Amino acid sequence: MKTIKRATLLLLFAIIYDACPTIACTGISLHAADGSYIQARTIEWAASPLPSEYVIIPRGKKLRSYTPTGRNGITFTSRYGVVGLSVVESDFIAEGINEVGLSAGLFFFPRYGSYEPYDEAHNAITLADLQVVEWLLTQFATIEELKAAVESLRIVGLDSSAVVHWRIGEPSGHEVVMEIVGGDIHFYDNHIGVLTNAPGFEWQMANLENYVNLRAGSAQPLQLGEVTLQPLGGSSAMLGLPGDFTPPSRFVRAAFFRNTAPKRATGEATIEQAFHLLNNFDVPIAVENP
């Protein structure tokens, strides 16, 4: 029975990782005037139906990580209650929040990230990348606590073909991106409030400088010799904003939409605003599967 279950899990892992090119994750964070902090995201899965479920983890639950050779990784007991949405397995929380307000989500990060090589001798401190959200939300109240603890672990992938990176936020609005490159863990303050997929966060931020000409609103009329040119419609000062579904283009589009959006009065109104903004990142299935 254990052999059958492990084979089934390996097949599910293969489905997740093989579909990486068809996954488009776009995350934004928003602040309301009443102090509420909202994290919102999409998971555009254009390959096949994605098994997912609502997960509740109470305090005091004993948990164990998977490794590439089975469920024999690090063991831990939840210190905080957690709610979240999982993919494939209930332990693989894609987005969640704990009882003290720390929130986290994973975003696929193919080709650019790389973990430490898996070594079965270190199973006692080995944590699967797809269980990092489960681990950190059940263990920590702050980002600083996470930073102090994560260096003692070996985070590995259950399949070598893809990796993920993570967005972590506190109720105050302090938000970081965590990436692992060459086995080294990097944290970046996320002041822009956006995350997509590859390339890495530093590259995405540098790429934003290609769009310093963009503005909210309409462009001013231009006198060209004896001809006066007028904008053809509203939001013409955003002409040049990328509209495709690649991660760099979604990052730029989300950054401008998020940072030009008016601040709403309440958290509830900001949740509605987040849905409206993220509608701009729906990926039609036929785009990936013609």
Predicted regions and their residues:
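Proteins synthesized as precursors that undergo proteolytic processing into mature forms
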Residues: 122-156, 160, 267-276
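C-terminus-biased signal that marks the final domain/tail of proteins
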Residues: 23-38, 46, 51-52, 158-162, ...
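Bacterial N-terminal signal peptides
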Residues: 8-18
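Short helix/loop capping segments that flank catalytic or ligand/cofactor-binding pockets
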Residues: 48-49, 113-115, 176-179, 186-190, ...
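A contiguous strand-loop segment
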Residues: 24-121, 160-162
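Catalytic cofactor-binding cores of redox enzymes
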Residues: 152-185
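Bacterial N-terminal signal peptides that target proteins for export
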Residues: 1-8
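Short acidic-glycine loop/turn motifs at beta-strand connectors
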Residues: 31-34, 98-100, 170-173, 179-184, ...
